[in-house]
Amino acid sequence: MKRRYSILIILLVAIFYRMITFRFKYLLGYDPYFHLAYIEEVNKVGKWINFLTFAGGPWGYQVKLFHPLGLWMTPLYLYKLLKVFGVSLTTTFKITPVIFGVLTVIFLYLSLLKLYDEKRAFFGGFFLAISYGHVFRSMANYYRGDNYMLFWYSVALLGISLALGIKKGKWKYKRLIFYTLPVLASGFSAIFWQAYYPIFAFLLSNALLLAVGAFILKKDKYLLDSIILILSTAFGVLLANYLGGIFGYGMLGYAKWLGKSVAKKLGLEFGYLKDVYLILHLKYLVPISLSFVLVLILLGFLTKDIRIRSLFLGIASFIGIIILFKRFEALKELSTGFGIFKEAPILETQPTSFKDLWAAFSLSFFLTPLFFIRFKKPRVEDFLTLGLIIPSVYMLKTWTRFLFIGSMAIAIMSGIGIVELYEAIKPRLNGKKALATGIITLVILPGVIAGLSFKEVCSLHPEMNEAWERALKWLKNNSNENDVILAWWDWGHFITYYARRSPIAQGGPSVGVALYLLGKLNENWAINLGVDYVIVSYYDFLKFGAILSTANLSKRYNIRGYGLVVLPLRASTGALIFENRGYRAIVRHDKSWNAVIIYNGQMIYPRKLYVEHKEGVQEIKPPESNSNTYLYVNLNYGYAIFMNGNAFNTTLVRLFITPEKPYKLVYSDGGLIKIFKLEHPNVKVERRESNVILNFENGTSLGLYFFLDNGTMVLSKWYNVKGKNEFIVPKVNASVARYVLKRGKKVVDRGVFRLSYN
């Protein structure tokens, strides 16, 4: 196949797979809604802002403590280029992941072309183009930062391949200039994603394995490439540190709690370098790696015997690892994010299961061992590739989050492996058998993998829907700009985007919210956080297991004995039949409502039956009951919820079915989403002419805290407001203000609002 056709096929396939999800009206997942909300706000005011008042309730949210600005700059500046063609900001945001995902595929193809040959480059690029493991974080409508990290690594790999691909001629040493690409790529990756560090680990591993290959294969001239690649990561660290001062540092930066915590664990101090990993890399990993290569160079002069070289190599590697972990024992916790993700019930930080691997890579995962056929007659390029494979495999087994980052290694191994298999078999066959083998191996098998990946991509659907959009837009139009919202954390970014209101939980599990929904914390806890509205939904019941797991992180409460199952409607002829997970609820309405639940052959009659229809929720006491269970039936949307007494008595269920004061139902769509106003002395921000006025009732003291947009507090003061119902906010040179309203010593409301964009 001609090269131009190969790259065209890979390009079209990569675009096609990643644009499948563009058909959706809504974004996929949760985090993209926060990113788009921030970008829209920046575009509206015409400048970069740090302190957000519609996130992180009730305190507000500082973007500088999240990702570097490059994550949001890219789609915004791309939009400024595309808007002349009529492309909207939302559309630009949706397709930005596709652009960088496709570029990653193309750069991988070009890299493999220089390192190997056309066939291996084509299949390596093709497998990455169709890999669901790569597609699902580089597809339209799903915007995530790790897409940029892998893109920049592909740029770095291209630079390495260009440097290694020139064997002789006048470019023999000038070729080393291509190692500036790893410098730039690793440095620039720091401004696009807060967890960009794997690119440095990959490049360092590439360098070390390149040295190992050169040493074992007696290709000692490549040891120079290894040294230069190691040094390129050092210059990349300096560039990343410099850019961090402009665009913001990564998650291990000096101003972030994780950076401070890990620095303390590792015994590191911030100085010129403002990031824990950058310090660790430059001060320890680079010197140890250089020492390792220099030892290999010295040994190369002493012996040419491969067995002796291999022995010394093993000893040197073992000593290097011992030194590193002896100096930094806390590195043993690296795979758990230094302990912060050991128990958190987040799907992305769970160990990878076979089911996850199958969904991400299907049959291509089983082709990966074929890559090692090359090691019958290895080349230094194979060892360089191992430098990506080894850390990728470690990451793959650690977290499902790393399926994407490991997808490039899987694509390379399976793509090259399938060619190795074919070329190993082909000489033993001739005629039609050789042709049939070629068709099966190089056409049908990749086609099956492509089909399985296509099925996975097509199975995706947004968590956001019209019910959420209607509810949150209603909330935006019927609440105050400073109102604080309580909902399960998965919906927090939805609230930020559609309602432009501040949720108290978003982007990560909240133990407090979980305990509140289970009734372990009451409304006084919520009022102390300034909560004005509480959202409960049908979707919360689908997350009930996660709510229990999150609440279990608290050591104060015993979270046991909760039983709840959601039962979809399966049949409606004669009787309503709801069924799921072995439970079957049969509900009839003759002269009155009655219900029975069948489980393991046992007939269970609930203590109470609740039926919601267009007129509202109807409570029915069945004529007979033999259990402390409850059944809620929703006729509007065709589902039922069967629960035991513990689950029924949670705040989540009580609000959804039988709300009481101080909660007032203000919005309901009949069974999907319900919004309650938590009635308490509430502060309302009002703007009259040039004044900002706080309206309230039943308060005795008001605390105001004024901040610059960069998060610096410039003034804090308490005011006596007893007998007053409004307060004119003093004019202070500040951008954001937090408020706390007290009645006596009790906090009755709090929140945050913007003063200006200065």
Curated annotation (Swiss-Prot):
Span(s) of short sequence motif WWDYG motif: 488-492
Motif (TIXE motif): 340-343
Site feature (Interacts with target acceptor peptide in protein substrate) residues: D31, E343, K543
Residues on Extracellular side: 28-92, 142-145, 248-281, 332-352, 401, 455-758
Protein name: Dolichyl-phosphooligosaccharide-protein glycotransferase 2
The species this protein was found in: Pyrococcus horikoshii (strain ATCC 700860 / DSM 12428 / JCM 9974 / NBRC 100139 / OT-3)
Chain positions of motif DXD motif 1: 29-31
Pathway(s) the chain acts in: Protein modification; protein glycosylation
GO cellular component, one term: plasma membrane
Top-rank taxon, per record: Archaea
Membrane-crossing segments per the record: 7-27, 93-113, 121-141, 146-166, 176-196, 197-217, 227-247, 282-302, 311-331, 353-373, 380-400, 402-422, 434-454
One term of GO molecular function: metal ion binding
Cofactor(s) the protein needs: Mn(2+); Mg(2+)
Membrane association type: Multi-pass membrane protein
Assigned protein family: Belongs to the STT3 family.
Gene Ontology BP annotations: protein glycosylation
